[in-house]
């Protein structure tokens, strides 16, 4: 897992969902562990798109349900544009 991307994702998640830093771990589920509802998730995806200057289509965003999956997906997008 790309540590730099994880740290940036972690910061966005903490800011967007207002959760404690120690709860943002790769296996944390946005809905179950971080109590994000569907609106929170949409706003989180938008914030991640802005932070990383990428676009995440809705069908891909629906599959991103944990912090680790977000990091993995963003890593692939960032590497593809590098």
Curated annotation (Swiss-Prot):
Top-level lineage group: Bacteria
Carrier domain boundaries: 3-78
Keyword tRNA processing on entry: no
GO biological process, alphabetically ordered: lipid A biosynthetic process
O-(pantetheine 4'-phosphoryl)serine: residues carrying this PTM: 38
Origin species: Gloeothece citriformis (strain PCC 7424)
InterPro entries in the cross-refs: ACP, ACP-like_sf, PP-bd_ACP, Ppantetheine_attach_site
Name the record gives this protein: Acyl carrier protein
Signal peptide annotation: none
Compartment(s): Cytoplasm
GO molecular function: acyl binding; acyl carrier activity
